[in-house]
């Protein structure tokens, strides 16, 4: 764990997902996930020193998944669902959580879609 941002003592919990422009500049020391931003840091190889979160930008996962993670996007989707309490609180609608994300594949698979577990079709002629 390279990120120096503080996680709340009660653990991460989200009530909403926001985009960076919606919150402006995030709180300086508080975990970006705790502020409602999707940050790929927890599922990303930590060799960069968490440079993006240091300056208030959520990690996009550009160094790929950790060795312990087979599918980076699936891991983050699971983490976000956990942060919303989908597993414990049966009143949380997983579809409502997903609706808050404009582009699930683009958000969680920006750098790793070809290696993901998402089944893809290859059409003749490359289309």
UniProtKB/Swiss-Prot annotation:
Keyword Oxidoreductase: yes
Disulfide topology: none
Gene Ontology molecular function, alphabetical: oxidoreductase activity
Record's keyword terms, sorted: Oxidoreductase
Class of the enzyme per the UniProt entry, highest EC level: oxidoreductase
EC number: 1.12.99.-
Subunit architecture: The F420-non-reducing hydrogenase is composed of three subunits; MvhA, MvhD and MvhG. It forms a complex with the heterodisulfide reductase (hdr).
Similarity section: Belongs to the [NiFe]/[NiFeSe] hydrogenase small subunit family.
Function, in words: Part of a complex that provides reducing equivalents for heterodisulfide reductase.
Protein name in UniProt: F420-non-reducing hydrogenase subunit G
Gene assigned in the entry: mvhG
């Amino acid at each position: 764990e390279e990120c120096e941002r503080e996680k709340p003592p009660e653990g991460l919990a989200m009530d909403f997902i926001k985009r960076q422009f919606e919150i402006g500049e995030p709180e300086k020391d508080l975990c970006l996930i705790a502020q409602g931003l999707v940050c790929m840091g927890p599922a990303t190889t930590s060799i960069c020193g968490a440079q993006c979160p240091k300056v208030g930008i959520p990690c996009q996962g550009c160094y790929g998944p950790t060795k312990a993670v087979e599918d980076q996007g699936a891991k983050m989707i699971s983490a976000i669902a956990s942060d919303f309490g989908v597993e414990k609180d049966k009143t949380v609608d997983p579809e409502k959580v997903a609706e808050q994300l404009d582009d699930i594949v683009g958000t969680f698979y920006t750098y790793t879609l070809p290696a993901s577990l998402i089944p893809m079709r290859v059409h003749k002629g490359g289309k």
